[in-house]
Amino acid sequence: MKPESRQAVAHFLTAAGRELNAFLEGLEADDYKAAVQMIRESRRGGGRVHVTGIGKPGHVAGYMASLLSSTGTPAYFLHGTEAVHGSCGQLVAGDVVICIS
């Protein structure tokens, strides 16, 4: 690997690590626990998780829905724009919606 490529990778990883640390510092433990509890209760009642976002957050939402689904939590990606044009019909009482901005 060229030195400038190695330097670019190091710069990216440093920036990504800094952003991840800032994100983790901003998490409120009680809020996180409440969200997890909400998802658990929904699941027990037969509910599902819908994750939504538009643009880059939409890509993250799709990936998050996929991760949840592959680990046993019924989850779906709900496109933020299409949701207001009829796609909300897939939501039922007891479901949880996670919005990513």
Where are the regions that the model predicts?
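Conserved N-terminal alpha-helical segment that immediately precedes and caps sugar-phosphate-binding
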Residues: 1-101
